[in-house]
Amino acid sequence: MKRIEATIQTDKTSAVSDAIKELVGGYTILEGNGRGSGKRQEIRSGRGTGSFTAEYNKVAVVITYVDDADAEKVISAIASASFTGKGGDGIITVSSMESALNIASKKTGSEAL
């Protein structure tokens, strides 16, 4: 089993959701602020006379759990849906999971997903 976590631009949330909803049993999307290694966005002030560099970028984090056999399909779908070709597209991390328990059904392992 794998835990896939993708930090993406917030405007790509719908595209990623559409891309993975048929591939996974469920997923979680969290919104927040992040700071990657890339350049920060420059923001103009209200009157347009000044600007400042944002300390953080708005990001969305998509988390899902899948069988090992499905991991590459899900990773590919997320990468394709979130790609803009510019810096700041995000990052996808994959972790191995030792076990899982569905609290409601009491199913364990891959059946819990």
Q: Language-model features: where?
A:
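Positively charged, small/polar-rich N-terminal and surface patches that mediate targeting and assembly
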Residues: 1-113
